[in-house]
Structure formats: structure tokens, C-alpha cells
Amino acid sequence: RSSAASDVYKRQYNISSQIFFKMLDNKDIIPCCTGMIQKEVAERIAAGPGSKTYGILSVLIQAWYKVEYLFTVSEHVFNPPPKVKSAVIRMTRNDTQELGCDEKLFKQVVKTTFNQRRKTLRNSIKPILGKECPLTEDTLFNKRPEQLSVEEFIDLTNKVEIALKEMNLQP
């Protein structure tokens, strides 16, 4: 019996995001996942930095998986037809074993900054670092979260962790 699991599915669309967060919690035993999901969610997962659809799911999944948007499925191939288009994506576990930063803090940084996605990092990181954010002189903080790659989020997380330690706060 293998310790790895794969998943091929077509899930209820209203719960697909929660399924992906659970998949991330079990990433060590899920090397590959192929599924048909709502097109909008598939586009968010596969989106790159700079895209309007790039967000929390994009960053967290792409930190651990290579994402391939395979194809779009018309609503007309189903009977009865749903009100939304579908898409098939494949996620294959990348070689990353460790992110190079505190994983729990990474998730917190990604979620916190994207919860205020139209603000610069200088302002969106304040819920974690407080109003007297010691890092705001760094040019990275002039960017908005949707402009950062996964690697830049890892760098940001390391900077936040150092700042928290300097302020005698725990990440």
C-alpha cells in the first residue's frame, strides 16, 4: 500500500476552495491532483503575479504544486447544463520540501495581505506588525500583494519574522 494519494474528481463547485486548503494540509501524501472545477476557481489557482485573479489560492497552491490549466469545459456538455463553465486543472507536487520560511507565518502573511489587496504591503501588513511597522522603508513594501511571486512572499515572510523577533513578538 502506497503512502501517497492522488485525486481525480469533479466536486461540488461551492466547496472547491475548502478542498484545496485541505489538500495543502495533506500535501505530503498528495503528489498529484487532477480535477474539473469552476472555471473561475481554476483561473485563480493557475494565475500568475500581476493578474487580477492572482490571490491567496494561487500563492499557497503554487508554493507546493506546479499548476496546469488543461482545458475549459462548456456548460452545454452537461445535462442539465450548469450556469457556469468548468475547467480541468492538474496540480503536480513540486520538489519543494521546505519553503525557506515559517510555513504558518507564510500563510498568515499571504492571507493578511490579500485581504487588503488594493493596499500596498506597507499598509496591508500592519495587522501582523502593528502600526509602527519597522520594515516600511524596504522597497518591497511599495508593492501590492498581487505583484509578488511566491518567492517574494517567502522573502516577505522572512522579513516579517525578523521584524517580529526584533519587536519581541512571536510569529
Identify the residue ranges that each predicted region occupies.
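Single conserved hydrophobic/aromatic residue that forms the stacking wall/gate
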Residues: 1-5, 9
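Class I S-adenosyl-L-methionine
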Residues: 15-148, 155, 161-171
